[in-house]
Every structure is written in structure tokens, then in C-alpha cells.
Amino acid sequence: MRLRGLSIIFCTLAVAATIPAIAHHSFAAEFDINRPISLDGVVTRFELSNPHSWLHLEITTEAGEKQQWQVEGGAPNALIRRGWTRTSVPAGIQVHVEGFQARDRSFRASGREITLPDGSSLFMGSVGIGAPSTE
């Protein structure tokens, strides 16, 4: 009987420990689907690294102030299958990014699509839990 009780406690704790990981991988937990955002800026850095890629942009507002934005992209594996490489988005180029702003209204977003200077575009998102459909 004691072994059964310990097994139940252990299983309950194991399941409870996975909840933060599931929440972290939820689009809706971090980003607001009701706050689509369009960003035009200069790439300062692109990180094609696990678990998510990151595009760093310098945006100049209409008032002339500079903002440093971080745009989260999909996992490198997913982006590479869609045609991305480490040199797809070099520092210094002007890009247009569509996405969804962070719930905390920081200068952070989940990227949906990026348009490069030559007019080509790449899907930069993931199809995670709560993310808008790619269709």
C-alpha cells in the first residue's frame, strides 16, 4: 500500500513538472493574436539557434526614436526546411516583418513573415499551440 501511495505522489509530481514546459511552448501564453504588428527596420543580428530563432531589429519610430526589437521565429529545423540559412538575413539590411506583439507589450514579437529587400518573403513562424494557421 505504501508503495502505491509513493507511486501516485511521484506520478503527480512528474506531471506537474511538465506544465511550465507546455505553457512555455504555447503561442497564446506569450503573444497576443489580437495585436498583429508590422515592423520595418534594420537587422542588427539573426540567430538561427535552438530552441527558437531570433531576429534583432532596430526600428526608427515616426517620432525619430530608436527601438530595439526581438522577433522570435520558429525552430531552426523548421526554418531550414523552408529555405532559411544562417546568411538569409544578414545584419544591415532593411526588412519588413509581420507578426504578433508580446502580451507584456515589450519590444518583442512572434514573427510570421519577413520580406527581404529583393521583395522575396520567408515564413518565419512556427505552427505551435495557439499560433495562427498558416493556411
What does each of the following model-derived ranges do?
Residues 80-97:
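Short nucleic-acid-contacting surface segments enriched for D/E, G, S/T with interspersed K/R
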Residues 22-37:
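Short boundary/loop segments of OB/S1/cold-shock single-stranded nucleic-acid-binding domains
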Residues 49-59:
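Short aromatic-glycine-enriched beta-strand elements
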Residues 102-126:
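OB-fold/S1-family single-stranded nucleic acid-binding modules
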